[in-house]
């Protein structure tokens, strides 16, 4: 039994994609006998941009855009070598950024 834990942080623009990826990671870790805490949804980061609609005049007419970045956090406790091998072989979608730390 190890005292270290694996912390996985997922980041994506599409919430459905990140939830599916988090579920795959949880199922894979539980299949190998590890204990998983999470996925914990972290606050969504919202970036807003104001862009002029007209190239010359009409400063009052603007387009408002936003980008939402969804975050999920998971801790894998009591992991084994089988768990790390299974997580390394896991194929996640291209729109999900995965950050893994061993603490």
From Swiss-Prot:
Keywords: Ribonucleoprotein, Ribosomal protein
Taxonomic superkingdom: Bacteria
InterPro entries, A to Z: Ribosomal_uS10, Ribosomal_uS10_CS, Ribosomal_uS10_dom, Ribosomal_uS10_dom_sf
Molecular-function annotations in GO: structural constituent of ribosome; tRNA binding
Pfam family, one: Ribosomal_S10
Gene Ontology biological-process entries: translation
Annotated signal sequence range: none
Entry's Gene Ontology cellular component terms: ribonucleoprotein complex; ribosome
Gene3D superfamilies according to UniProt: Ribosomal protein S10 domain (3.30.70.600)
Keyword check for Ribosomal protein: yes
Free-text function comment from the UniProt entry: Involved in the binding of tRNA to the ribosomes.
Subunit structure: Part of the 30S ribosomal subunit.
Similarity comment: family membership: Belongs to the universal ribosomal protein uS10 family.
PANTHER family associated with the record: 30S RIBOSOMAL PROTEIN S10 FAMILY MEMBER
Alphabetical list of NCBIfam families matching this protein: PRK00596.1, rpsJ_bact
Identification of the protein by name: Small ribosomal subunit protein uS10
Organism whose genome encodes this protein: Neisseria gonorrhoeae
Lineage per the UniProt record: Bacteria, Pseudomonadati, Pseudomonadota, Betaproteobacteria, Neisseriales
């Amino acid at each position: 039994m190890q005292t270290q834990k694996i912390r996985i942080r997922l980041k994506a623009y599409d919430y459905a994609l990140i939830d599916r990826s988090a579920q795959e990671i949880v199922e894979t870790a539980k299949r190998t006998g590890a204990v998983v805490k999470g996925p914990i949804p972290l606050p969504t980061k919202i970036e807003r941009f104001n862009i002029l609609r007209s190239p010359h005049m009409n400063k009052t007419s603007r387009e408002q855009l936003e980008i939402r970045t969804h975050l999920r956090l998971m801790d894998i406790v009591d992991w084994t070598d089988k768990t790390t091998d299974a997580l390394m072989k896991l194929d996640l979608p291209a729109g999900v950024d995965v950050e893994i730390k061993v603490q």
